[in-house]
Amino acid sequence: MPELTDLSYVHALCEKYDFALSKGFGQNFIVNPGLPPKIVDASGVDKRYGVLEIGPGIGVLTRELAKRAAKVVSIEVDERLPPLLAETMAGVDNFKLVLQDVLKVDLKALIAQEFPGMPVAVCANLPYYITSPIVMKLLGDRLPIESLTVMVQKEAADRLAAAPGTRASSAISCAVSYYATSKMMFTAAPGSFYPAPKVTSAVVRMEIRPTPAVQVEDEEGYFALVRAAFGQRRKTAANAIASGLGMPKDAVTAAIEAAGFDARIRPEALTLEDFAKIQSTLAR
């Protein structure tokens, strides 16, 4: 099997199957041979693990995962890719392709069916345009997984790894911190991919917490509050929450002050615990 990161082979493979990379699917294939082992190292995957991969492309990361893990199940939405993967993954017995949209798949059922008795990890080179919805589904569905290790745009990685209460925090930062601990592992230059994106990429590892970081009575309401707070970044938390939730500003301001905060506080200055306090006072 030729090296899947060899650009001449990638071109020949795409030409053989009349395959044109799709901007709509955010396809950027890995062409840096040192990158797949580094990603798998960061994931901590070994022969005990079942691995759920999202967006295998032509199988560059997939082959490395299959070398290290007990089993790899890759979810792919592009119906043109199976013939290419049939060639590049030929002879890899612990690999299975699921041709579905990851946002529509019952992942709990899939994991139960494909990985009985195994610890499970997610490892993926995610399409940049849909990073947040995929991460939120993987976390919010409370899947029986130990970790998520994802290659994403550096800007998105900064948000995924940011601690709530810091300048870089956002709604997705709060969600990640609620469900997991996160760490930026390393960056990858644009030339590591074909076609080369215009931005630097980065790998983030998220380790799932056994229980959420804070206890809230109404999780759906909690995240609605967080999303509202960050929905208008240049506004104070009071203004943004009032606007986002359709509540009187006076009531929101009173709740924020009753929770012990200055009414002019910005959302990025609030921690998970702070949001929980504000939600509790709003609910009274």
Name every feature range the model reports, one short phrase each:
Residues A263-A269:
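Short, flexible active-site recognition loops that position polar ligands and cofactors
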Residues T253-A255:
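A short C-terminal helix-loop "cap" of Rossmann-like NAD(P)-dependent dehydrogenase/epimerase domains
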Residues A202, M206-I208, V214-A251, D262, ...:
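An accessory alpha-helical subdomain
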Residues M1-E220, A224-A228, E257, E268, ...:
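Catalytic cores of RNA-modifying enzymes
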